[in-house]
């Protein structure tokens, strides 16, 4: 078929500008169109090299405009300027309109030019020999019929139907390629369409969906037949003036078309056609040929596999949590429990597993209620992370003193040690902790039956930084060990004793005299009397006092403590039958910072509630459960008069009617009233909110 339609070898290096025929190369200095600033075309993705583009090779208009035959006649230059295209015809009228227009255009060419061009490039050797014997006119006629049939089938497979007609200055092949598949031409005018037949292999271009940006039919306009970029189809460059050879914009914009794929042929064809028209007329061609080689590097590229992909923005990247800095991820993981980190987060990926093994997560270990925690496991944990500062092994029944000793030996920086209800542990464990962890600040070892005063002595003498101790229900502890701790640990702030029958007033006195920083004191159920409790008036920083179930506690001692300890915010006097209305009235008047008052099972009446509501402006929580003398009057008056009350406990106050409580709940929604029925309602409401539904089948059975 000649070098025009032959494939370009795959191993040949890419050309920097479109290849043209010899006539163009010899006369390129004459083809100079005015230089115009072009907007930088958007880069288009390169298509796979395995696909053969129709537009590769020399420009297809060269053999028409610059045919080596006889000189072109002047009829082509005398064609009137292009006018805005008429409204797009429907269905089969596309082919008729295009055929008539191009028939008039190519009729101006010399018949010899058409014949020579067809014989040289498009016809096979046999067809050329047969056509040589015929007249030039009949040859052009046969050539047009064959081209119309071939390009109609090619255009039908390339583009969607319903796209409006586009006027081009190039050959009819370019027009058919960027137009909807035309209907078969009318039978009346089959011979007027002078089209060329392309038999090049791989001439197909992948179909694309119509784009939203309209294109001009002229190759010189932005977004025109040239498509991708460069002088012919930049899309972003300003429109050319009419004298430059571009089409005029119609009054109504044409239907949107797909942008043509960028290629050397599609970009250089309109410019060469315009230049050819000027040369044929005998005038001086504008200097556009100088700009063509310059833009060939960037514009003459293979089209993408899908030509419309160049107009689509790449999908936004999905944010990934792993893009956050490790410090932020560690802060997030710090809000997870040990189970959530070890059994959930660490199994997501290796990166999260490494983060979950960060040393800061192993500073504070909560191993409570885990029966699988043994001495061997505790030793491995301590060996892996020797910077543990807090550990909780409450209810770990599989541990022994040896495991705690290894932990204390490998974690000398331990600050907080908690071991509730570990009845298997003895003084050995507490002595090991005291010996190897001198910075210890918190020791909670409640309900350890084997703990004695010997362990407390070692703890007090070695750990001078103790601030918080809890020895509740350690029944073998006595004043001997407690006094050693009180005299040695002068920084104590919290102490809690519960049911330690061997602890008496001497221990209370020792703590009051040697530990002035005490803020929380609890001696629930201990053998303490008013003689020892009165020493607590020396504690100016006392904020919470728990004196539950002190059988020999009198009202005067309580009133004196409230008067002296101005920072007292919580007072628990439950299970003290001697506390009466007069004591409660003094507490309400003198407790300037008191917020919580617990009077369960005390000998009080409605007058105590009325006094609280009348005299106190700070008390928020009042619990008078199991007080048999409390009635509807007291509950109603305290709710009406107190401005600070937020909780009122009336559990098992049998003289308080439930209907009265229901009315109070409606009238004072800011107050929580605690009764058996009200607590049940709140519990059910929380269960429903968490998704619980009653099992009606089990209830009926």
Curated annotation (Swiss-Prot):
One of its GO terms (biological process) is proteasome-mediated ubiquitin-dependent protein catabolic process. InterPro entries: F-box-like_dom_sf (IPR036047), F-box_dom (IPR001810), F-box_LRR-repeat (IPR050648), Leu-rich_rpt (IPR001611), Leu-rich_rpt_Cys-con_subtyp (IPR006553), LRR_dom_sf (IPR032675). It comes from Mus musculus (Mouse). Residues 73-93, 227-250, 279-321 are annotated as: Disordered. Residues 227-236 have a biased composition (Gly residues). Part of the SCF (SKP1-CUL1-F-box) E3 ubiquitin-protein ligase complex SCF(FBXL17) composed of CUL1, SKP1, RBX1 and FBXL17. Interacts with BTB domain-containing proteins such as KLHL12, BCL6 and BACH1; specifically recognizes and binds a conserved degron of non-consecutive residues present at the interface of BTB dimers of aberrant composition. Interacts with SUFU. Interacts with PRMT1. GO terms for cellular component: cytoplasm; nucleoplasm; nucleus; SCF ubiquitin ligase complex. The gene is Fbxl17. It comes from the Eukaryota. Substrate-recognition component of the SCF(FBXL17) E3 ubiquitin ligase complex, a key component of a quality control pathway required to ensure functional dimerization of BTB domain-containing proteins (dimerization quality control, DQC). FBXL17 specifically recognizes and binds a conserved degron of non-consecutive residues present at the interface of BTB dimers of aberrant composition: aberrant BTB dimer are then ubiquitinated by the SCF(FBXL17) complex and degraded by the proteasome. This is F-box/LRR-repeat protein 17. Residues 81-90 have a biased composition (Pro residues). It is found in: Cytoplasm; Nucleus. Residues 285-294 have a biased composition (Polar residues). Residues 318-365 form the F-box domain.
